[in-house]
Amino acid sequence: MSLWGQPLQASPPLAVRQPPTASSGPSTSPPAGATLNRLPEPLLRRLSESLDRAPEGRGWRQLAELAGSRGRLRLSGLDLEQCSLKVLEPEGSPSLCLLKLMGEKGCTVTELSDFLQALEHTEVLPLLNPPGLKITVNPESKAVLAGQFVKLCCRATGHPFVQYQWFKMNKEIPYGNSSELVFNTVHVKDAGFYVCRVNNSSTFEFSQWSQLDVCDVAEVTDSFQGSMDGISESRLQICVEPRSQRLVPGSMLLLQCVAIGSPMPHYQWFKDESPLTHETKKHYTVPYVDIEHEGTYWCHVYNDRDSQDSKKAEVTIGRTDEAVECTEDELNNLGHPDNKEQTGQPLAKDKVALLIGNMSYWEHPKLKAPLVDVYELTNLLRQLDFKVVSLLDLTEYEMCNAVDEFLLLLDKGVYGLLYYAGHGYENFGNSFMVPVDAPNPYRSENCLCVQNILKLMQEKETGLNVFLLDMCRKRNDYDDTIPILDALKVTANIVFGYATCQGAEAFEIQHSGLANGIFMKFLKDRLLEDKKITVLLDEVAEDMGKCHLTKGRQALEIRSSLSEKRALTDPVQGAPCSAEALVRNLQWAKAHELPESMCLKFQCGVHIQLGFAAEFSNVMIIYTSIVHKPPEIIMCDAYVTDFPLDLDIDPKHANKGTPEETGSYLVSKDLPKHCLYTRLSSLQKLKEHLIFTVCLSYQYSGLEDTVEEKQEVNVGKPLIAKLDMHRGLGRKTCFQACRMPDEPYHSSTSTSAGAGHFHSSQDSFHDVYHSHLGNADSGMPPDRCHCSRTPHTFISNYPPHHYCQFGRSNVPVETTDEMPFSFSDRLMISEN
């Protein structure tokens, strides 16, 4: 039951279950137990006028006689004479005098109503008992598809009129003052809990809560997209089907089924025709699968009006999904695949991926697609058994340290993959990734050179080096430095997948509030295919070429020296772990440790559950919920605050009712409902333990004052913060283009400050790989530099000149009505 005595269709978060404040104020109708002297003067006069005009036998004298029958209300003869004399006054009223005397003796509104009923004064009874409000139609919870026309309805009856006001959670909706709340085109951000307040001139009531769940079009199954034109707001339809998967033991299984319809759909998962206990959400997750999880899965979706079954998904656990014949000797050798000739397939010693998405640039146009691209690629690579580190919005110094940590995870035979989405450029065949703190304009000393990173990866004798660069490759006219790099080793294991051709721009598709880069939109559909990586990228290029959105704008370019049939699906070698592998696994595991869920118990008896979820390696969601409240507490509200200044958290975006309100659109389906959510980003900046405060405010029944309690929580260093990337590894690897010998090594940007000094870190495993750090006083150890410069001055194609204000050309490309998506140019460099 809700706080107003009505059953809830869907429970909103505990912190907002109290109804929003009514703008009409307290009720003006007289309480039944109130005495007459508390009635408003206008109401008393209207009652007295009716009694003064009443026919004989139903007037004020008969009212006095009825009141006298209840001893305490008996009036004396002097009192009645006083009432009679009122007729001699110009505006005197015997009835008004009588009502006031009865009020002084404690006559209640209920008693007066009984007296008037006995005297058959039915015409004035509504003044004391106005017809109450009655909600006849409550809004219905529903699940819809982004872009649909959606309508929430509330109907009520009352006297003399009814007014409406809609709320989302506890926030009033502007212009939501009719009986219908209409979304001409509903968006993902519109998802949440809604309630309608109805009021007349004297009182107000609240409707039942209604939950609106909005499914993103990007998640919709291809087979469903073909029938979207005839979609119904009310009919139950499954729009996202679970997909078959081939997994290895220890990986995560995630099956998803999403339906739309009204009333709100419910879910029940099945495995091999048997229902799975407590699995009643859109998604079914097994963090670490084993052979016992192999089978056929499907989901039964239903509501009060209809039901449907999803398609069946086959989940296969193991190295291969094919049966093979082998001898006893071959069977004994399966546990020791010492060489790839035994299996006929290349083996990876391990698989490691670094994913960087830069969006929130300080001095340049902001991007949207890296958020979605990095998240989706992370999930796909984990299905392929990659150890993935995914990071958003890194400065130059943080990018250098992230690559350093990435290099520590590499070793002989390990597959290394680097994905970058953000601003970038290419000069003289060298690709440069632009950090979020790059100045305006930027040059090579402010950016990271991809070719230098490749050189360092080759030193690790990796089995495969894959670079996926989703950035622009136009020339930077502000950077006329020509770095001369040392020749790369001939390793025949290098693959570059460029999102666009040399000299061209890369674009992102914006739709339903989220965005995909064009490259990732097509790559994600093929990444899990068991094909040679170059063949896979060729097919992605063909897919892009067939799309009318990309023709003449963007085309995938592939550069490769791969001489073996290596694929991202290659199995990881099952040999016993070496010391280096153990350190590598520990280093990666440390960067992905979440704080354990905890239950805080306050002195008042309230219990608050704290939970944590990772969106990226440097982004964490904190969700809070009130799991126990003593009955004597009628209202309680919990929130988190006082975060370290390193994280720069905006309080306005904390403690929200939905993950989407915090800016987290991607993990909302995996988080528990009915909580308050806070998103912590840039965890790599955290210098000390993550300490924050949980505040609880509550109110006891019968008391108006609100009581507050606080508890301080220390969760250590979560996720990537454990690696202390802000300290670095005691060196600054030469990822930038080298400068003149007589130039200072450090750039003028603040991000490089202190990079040449050694800071020891107990969380860094650098000493395992590099026992000699070189001269700690040197700005750049000579053994870390792999590029050289032309003597004296740099080579320039343009004469020296002064640069004026740097122009920004990130203007969306014009589209026609036939192109439903808008383009946003990732290019940062432009000519004035």
Curated annotation (Swiss-Prot):
Annotated localization: Cytoplasm, Perinuclear region; Nucleus
Give the main location.
cytoplasm
The residues responsible for catalysis, as annotated, are H423, C472
Q: Which UniProt keywords apply?
A: Acetylation, Cytoplasm, Disulfide bond, Hydrolase, Immunity, Immunoglobulin domain, Nucleus, Phosphoprotein, Protease, Repeat, Ubl conjugation pathway
Q: Where is this region: Disordered?
A: 1-39
Q: Briefly, what is this protein's role? A: Protease that enhances BCL10-induced activation: acts via formation of CBM complexes that channel adaptive and innate immune signaling downstream of CARD domain-containing proteins (CARD9, CARD11 and CARD14) to activate NF-kappa-B and MAP kinase p38 pathways which stimulate expression of genes encoding pro-inflammatory cytokines and chemokines. Mediates BCL10 cleavage: MALT1-dependent BCL10 cleavage plays an important role in T-cell antigen receptor-induced integrin adhesion. Involved in the induction of T helper 17 cells (Th17) differentiation.
**PANTHER family cross-referenced by the UniProt entry:** MUCOSA ASSOCIATED LYMPHOID TISSUE LYMPHOMA TRANSLOCATION PROTEIN 1/PARACASPASE, MUCOSA-ASSOCIATED LYMPHOID TISSUE LYMPHOMA TRANSLOCATION PROTEIN 1
* Family in the record: Belongs to the peptidase C14B family.
Q: Oligomeric state and partners? A: Homooligomer; forms oligomers which bind to TRAF6. Forms a complex with CARD14 and MALT1; resulting in the formation of a CBM (CARD14-BCL10-MALT1) complex. Forms a complex with CARD11 and MALT1; resulting in the formation of a CBM (CARD11-BCL10-MALT1) complex. Forms a complex with CARD9 and MALT1; resulting in the formation of a CBM (CARD9-BCL10-MALT1) complex.
- This protein is called Mucosa-associated lymphoid tissue lymphoma translocation protein 1 homolog
What is the species of this protein? Answer: Mus musculus (Mouse)
Q: Which lineage do the record's taxonomy fields give for this organism?
A: Eukaryota, Metazoa, Chordata, Craniata, Vertebrata
